[in-house]
Amino acid sequence: MSEFSQTVPELVAWARKNDFSITLPTERLAFLMAIATLNGERLDGEMSEGELVDAFRHVSKGFEQTTETVAVRANNAINDMVRQRLLNRFTSEMADGNAIYRLTPLGIGITDYYIRQREFSTLRLSMQLSIVAQELQRAAEAAEEGGDEFHWHRNVFAPLKYSVAEIFDSIDMTQRLMDEQQHSVKEDIAALLNQDWRAAIASCEMLLSETSGTLRELQDTLEAAGDKLQANLLRIQEATIGNAGLDLVDKLVFDLQSKLDRIISWGQQAIDLWIGYDRHVHKFIRTAIDMDKNRVFAQRLRQSVQNYFDNPWALTYANADRLLDMRDEELSLRSEEVTGELPPDLEFEEFNAIREQLAAMIEQALLVYQQQKLPLNLGEVMRDYLAQYPRARHFDVARILVDQAVRLGVAEADFSGLPAEWLAINDYGAKVQAHVINKY
């Protein structure tokens, strides 16, 4: 069954003639993995029918199935796996009717996929590349020496076909397993973010960094050995030029070059795709934090204030004295008649008077919205108020107005996660971003 000689119609006819089919529900797949695990602990690699029944009993217990029909269901499962060429059955007259079972290459391949090859190992990849480099070095030297057809087949074609090509296939399989692992990590991250993104940030960071590190290790190892491997393949290819009888070797070298280029190229592309996904997740987290800081945090703060007597809390703040620059050269540039700060008493009385006046005005103006359940557009109301005061007082007036408005109610749009539009509140470029308050 050489990959160079079989065509698609021939493979279809071969599969139809041999009645190939694989049906592995979750229970049967677990049974097959249990057989592979127990078989790996044995030196002879053989299992009796009783041992298979015991393994099926463990699987049946794990799936919480009845124990009354274990023997019958185990026998059916064993026969089904023999029919699907996952197990080979050997019988002998010396064994008194007791059969011996061994895993087939198909069964080993399936269990290897689910058990043994799920973990990436940089050491394993380095050893594989080291073996490939040695095989290619010897094959290149043999190709440059030249010889008869037997020499080329034994010392060049055979190592390339049965050693180098198989290791390349193994590396390609490792990459494909990494592709599946990436999809699994993405599903885990999505599940974590959907449950509670605050608690999931650390777990997401760990999953992202681990996958990024594994991809980078894989690619660095491949790139470090890739140039040397390609150089030896080119040496073999140059040795076949002009020899019409070495077309099979030349085609094999070309296929290996293409496979190596594809492996290295896909490794870099996988890293680039993962970097894009990493940025997407971080952007989502930053957006969620900004939304929480600007929207949900305000709601939690209001609830904390309202429930203070049930759940008391303490607020600590720092208020350092301002540093005033009293140098002569600075004073000469100032045009104000008086420098420095106002006396604390005078400043407190002025600010307090404005606050009381605004509080009364806002309470009277907003009473209509609360009674009639009308939506309150904070941007429009704030613009009307600021037009009545000088520019120097706009910040204080806006702050008081916001404090009074949030005591009235909240905007249902705050919980949608969508940002509000920026609205101009004066003629000097000041803007406010707030949803319309519609829940009192």
Curated annotation (Swiss-Prot):
Stretches for region Leucine-zipper: 208-236
UniProt keyword terms in alphabetical order: Calcium, Cell cycle, Cell division, Chromosome partition, Cytoplasm, DNA condensation
GO molecular function: calcium ion binding
GO cellular component: cytoplasm; nucleoid
Main localization category: cytoplasm
Annotated compartments: Cytoplasm, Nucleoid
Pfam families in the record: KicB, MukF_C, MukF_M
Subunit and partners: Interacts, and probably forms a ternary complex, with MukE and MukB via its C-terminal region. The complex formation is stimulated by calcium or magnesium. It is required for an interaction between MukE and MukB.
Family: Belongs to the MukF family.
UniProt function note: Involved in chromosome condensation, segregation and cell cycle progression. May participate in facilitating chromosome segregation by condensation DNA from both sides of a centrally located replisome during cell division. Not required for mini-F plasmid partitioning. Probably acts via its interaction with MukB and MukE. Overexpression results in anucleate cells. It has a calcium binding activity.
Name of the featured protein: Chromosome partition protein MukF
Recorded name of the encoding gene: mukF
